Amino acid sequence: MGAGLGADSALGLPGENLQGVHGAVAWIEHMKLAKADMGAVKHAVIVGGGNTAIDAVREVKGLGVPSVTMLYRGTREGMSGYQHEWDAALQEGVSASWQSLPVAFEGTGRVQRVQCVKLDASKKPIAGTEFTLQADLVLLAIGQSKLGDMLASLGGITVNKGVIQVNAHGFTGRAKWYAGGDCTNGGKEVVNAAAEGKAAARAIDAAIMKGAARA
């Protein structure tokens, strides 16, 4: 099994249903299909600090948006995204607002502004530090939902915190069922999924050959 993860996670903030506010993964997929209309976008805000956020920042900047800001609740040193990718993004002209949190999206029909607040070291809002960012486009790169309920319904496998529990060979504990990728590791890189798929394939091949030898 390589079920991956579910839809982009949401923040549940006021104005999140405005046009122009999207999940980053869904937007990137849409953009790759050449369906993203960026003609009217002058200011973009990407919420998050992982590799998806950096991918989104660079894609948006590469499409010619003049002002692109990454809004992250932590510090640069604490972000999970690769530092070399962020260094490249800086060279391309993006900016960041560290230790910052969106509290509302505003606009008439379409997003125009993001209301934000600064955070202290414990990630608690600091009174009196509210600020506003202009935004024609907001992308939420705060993770993806896990398919725990669906996976658990399969029966015969163990699901913990939304991901399938497997051994080093991808075996789920249910006869002939192997899994790998985001549905087992919670969301890593393509290279991780490929490596886990190969490990499972080798284990499956070994099991088949062992059965053939017995026959």
Where are these regions (language model features)?
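Conserved beta-strand-loop-beta-strand element in the redox core of flavoprotein oxidoreductases
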Residues: 1, 107-132
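Rossmann-like NAD(P)H-binding beta-loop-alpha module
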Residues: 36-66
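FAD-site-proximal beta/loop scaffold in flavoenzymes
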Residues: 17-41, 123-187
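Rossmann-like dinucleotide-binding cores of NAD(P)H-dependent redox enzymes
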Residues: 57-104, 211-215
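N-terminal glycine-rich dinucleotide-binding loop that anchors FAD/FMN and/or NAD(P) in oxidoreductases
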Residues: 16-31, 35-38, 80-107, 113-116
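A conserved FAD-binding loop/helix module that cradles the flavin
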Residues: 56, 183-214
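Cofactor-binding loop segments of dinucleotide-utilizing enzymes, especially the Rossmann-like FAD-
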Residues: 49, 72-75, 182
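Conserved Rossmann-like nucleotide-cofactor binding loop
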Residues: 6, 52, 76
